[in-house]
Structure formats: structure tokens, C-alpha cells
Amino acid sequence: VNFIFNNLSHEEKVDFSCNNYPKKKNPGTAFVYHTSDTYLIGTSLNNLLSDKKENDFFDDLLVPIFNHHNFSDKIKYIRRTNDIRNQPYTGWGMFLQRDDLIKLNSLLQSSERIKYFSKEFLDEGLQRTEDKGLVAIKQSDIFYNNGFWAARFDKNIFGCKEDLMIPFMSGFGGITVVFLPNSMMYYYFSDNFTFSWYSAVYAAHNIKPLC
């Protein structure tokens, strides 16, 4: 099966990303997810930085944040194309330790996050605004907004005043990182295509109420 993972050079990846999924809907009207689209985002970011001192979004913008907050050395590496462009894969190819997830959750929960990231963009992704994003999986009440997935939980389950929108990140094969509204986090890394995590939400609520 031809997929963006099979293409090693920057030119091949851009060609695949642009030509294998023709546009069918107007932007912002229907949820469509392609991992290859994230590669185009990374390419666009580096193109925007090409005339600046910081010309690599990963090494020059993200790694300094990781350094400042004492993330592991593993997270400071990302897979890249095997050509002179040396383009970061962007949507995949990173490596994390468990402690990196804890530090990421702490950063996203703190006010310091707005020093590095757009407050509006991140608040939307973390379900802190009225903009809940687009429905991604209707039958499961799953949404997608600014790089984050979110699951809707009925307010009556936890005795809340409003339904809960719980943001999470999801990766191929069985990777889940859930950012709970009580500041707790749940993560599960596997390669057996297990994506069930709702029981962890109920357990977290018993430890510390979600609302």
C-alpha cells in the first residue's frame, strides 16, 4: 500500500500529500484527517521561517521550549527526510518518555503556555472555548479541533452542570494521551490497536471530581 511513510525524500512526500487526496469539501465544513496534511503544515512553517534566523520550526522553536522545561533528550529528536532539505516529519516520528508527558501536561495546564503558544488556538484545542471544532466520529461523539481530539461526556454521568468535553491526543497503533479537566492526565502507549480509555476517566473522577 502506498502511503506517505513509504516516501523518504521531501519532494516525494510533498507530491504524495498534494496529489493523493483531491479536495472534495470546502475548508472548515467537514472533518477530514490525513497524516500527510501534517507534513504540509511542517513544510509551510519552515518555508515561513526560511528568511529568518530560526529557520527550522522543530530545532529552533520547539527544542528551546523542551530545554527550558527539562524535557528528555528523546523528545528533542524527530525523524526527517533523507535529503538536503532535512524536513521534519511533523505529524509523526517523535519519541517520548513517560516523564515528557507529565511535563507536557503541566505546561498545558499552566499560564506559562501562552508564552509559547497562541492562547486562542490552544484554548480551542483544549475545549476551553465555545468553539468545539468539527464532529469527527458522530456515533462516538468525538470532535477534532486544532490538532486535538475531544470526547463529549454527558453531564449526568458526573453530576456536572454541562456536558464535559475531554481533549486527548491519539496515535497510530494504540497511543492515547488524555488531558482531564481536573488537571490529571491519563496515557496509554501500545501497539495492539487498543484505544479504550473511558474507564480511566471514571476512575479519575472518583479520585478528584471532573467538575
Residue ranges and their predicted role:
Residues 34-44, 97-106, 184-185:
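Well-ordered alpha-helical segments within folded domains of soluble proteins
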Residues 31, 96, 174:
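Short, flexible micro-motifs
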Residues 14-18, 98, 120-127:
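Short alpha-helical interface patches
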Residues 25, 93-96, 136-139:
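Short, conserved, surface-exposed binding loops centered on an aromatic residue
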Residues 50-52, 67, 85-90, 109-211:
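Catalytic loop of the DD-peptidase/beta-lactamase superfamily, centered on the K-T-G motif
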Residues 35, 55-59, 95-102, 115-119:
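Alpha-helix initiation and capping sites
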Residues 1-92:
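Catalytic-site signature segments of enzymes, centered on catalytic residues
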